[in-house]
């Protein structure tokens, strides 16, 4: 039955684990979303966040509903130099290259200064939504495949996605506003996206990089930058 899992403690444990997994793996997605939305006119940003995340949620639910197709993404399509390449590998490779290009472009605009950046400041609303949704698929691909392995209940997996996206919607604006107010934090976020891009490329060649190392590096960098912000606030130049 659809709701038979409600009385199963293991099902609740799976729901909590999957929700936490989706939220943690959604951190890089929130950072990317914040940077994309920042290029839109102020009046469109909140709408873009909601639409982008809602569309991303629908895409994730569609992936979960197509479990058989998702699990086949890991089947080899062809071999290059004894390296088996699957559809998942190609998606991660293209996603990693796009992230590196996007973040590098943003860093270049920031270094060139405000006048150069203003030429490309205003982005297309539809283009921003599409970017958010496509990158969310790439970010969530591994978590969806992992979810399939952690739970047999489709409803639990979908509930975890809905809860996680709800948390992301709640946090996205605060994170985005904070990044926009502090250029040094924005540069740190862009550097993190480049790191994530390289990680996706390595993953596409079956070189596994433990996510814990990446998130530790990110949180440590944020902690150091937070101390700098506090110091500068107390002792302005």
Curated annotation (Swiss-Prot):
Cytoplasmic side: 39-50, 101-124, 173-186, 231-237
Membrane-topology annotation of the record: Multi-pass membrane protein
InterPro entries: Integral_membrane_TerC (IPR005496)
GO CC annotation, single: plasma membrane
Membrane-side (Periplasmic) residue stretches: 1-17, 72-79, 146-151, 208-209
The organism's place on the tree of life at top rank: Bacteria
Organism of this sequence: Escherichia coli (strain K12)
Entry's family note: Belongs to the UPF0053 family.
TM ranges: 18-38, 51-71, 80-100, 125-145, 152-172, 187-207, 210-230
Name this protein carries in UniProt: UPF0053 inner membrane protein YgdQ
Subcellular location: Cell inner membrane
Family matches, as Pfam families: TerC (PF03741)
Membrane is among the record's keywords: yes
Keywords assigned: Cell inner membrane, Cell membrane, Membrane, Transmembrane, Transmembrane helix
